[in-house]
Regions:
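C-terminal ends and interior cores of transmembrane alpha-helices
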Residues: 85-100
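Glycine-rich segments within core transmembrane alpha-helices of 12-TM secondary carriers
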Residues: 140-163
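Helix-loop boundary and gating motifs at the non-cytosolic
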Residues: 2-61
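Helix-to-loop junctions at the C-terminal end of transmembrane segments
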Residues: 63-76, 162-163
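Hydrophobic core of transmembrane alpha-helices in multi-pass small-molecule transporters
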Residues: 22, 101-119
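Intracellular juxtamembrane helix-capping segments at the cytosolic ends
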Residues: 35, 118-132
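Residue-level signature of mid-helix packing/kink "hotspots" within the transmembrane helices
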Residues: 57-65, 151-152
Length: 171
């Protein structure tokens, strides 16, 4: 009850940013597992998963640089939201390919890297302007809790669902 009251006492921007961070923390493992499983299911080639991850981590620093220029014209909240939207676009792009080629996987990974880059570059700025010195530790601690909890629980839930579906419908 004390934690809920502490959350309620936070400024609106802090509460909205924490809610967004919590949603992202629970969705991100689903996206990552889905994309790796999709690549493996379509190609059974671990090198393609590695390529995808390499392109993701190539896209992040590229986005940080590009984001700096965009901030001159576009508010960080819009870029932050665009980053989350790009994650869905990456999945949509990859699953709509008629054939999962190396180039297609690379582009999907790069789009996901752009997604992460826009999210993280603008998230840090939004945290700084949405919190004060008095509640910033609360924010980061709560966000770290969500990330840790979701990072442990979501893979367990997803794997349980996959095993259930596999045994019930596949054999």
């Amino acid at each position: 009850m004390k934690d809920i009251n502490l959350f309620k006492s936070q400024p609106l921007n802090t509460k909205v940013l924490l809610a967004t961070a919590a949603i992202y923390a629970f969705v991100l493992p689903v996206i990552e597992i889905f994309q790796a499983a999709y690549i493996m299911g379509q190609s059974a080639d671990m090198a393609r998963v590695v390529l995808y991850q390499l392109m993701v981590y190539t896209g992040v620093p590229i986005t940080f640089i590009f984001n700096g220029f965009l901030l001159r014209k576009i508010a960080p909240g819009w870029l932050y939201s665009f980053g989350m939207l790009l994650g869905g676009i990456s999945m949509l792009y990859m699953t709509s390919l008629p054939e999962l080629t190396t180039g297609g996987i690379g582009i999907a990974g790069l789009i996901m890297g752009l997604s992460f880059g826009f999210f993280w570059a603008n998230r840090d700025y939004l945290v700084l302007v949405s919190t004060t010195d008095g509640n910033r530790n609360y924010y980061y601690g709560t966000e770290a809790f969500f990330n840790t909890f979701a990072g442990v629980v979501m893979p367990i839930i997803i794997s349980t669902i996959i095993v259930y579906i596999t045994h019930k419908y596949v054999g």
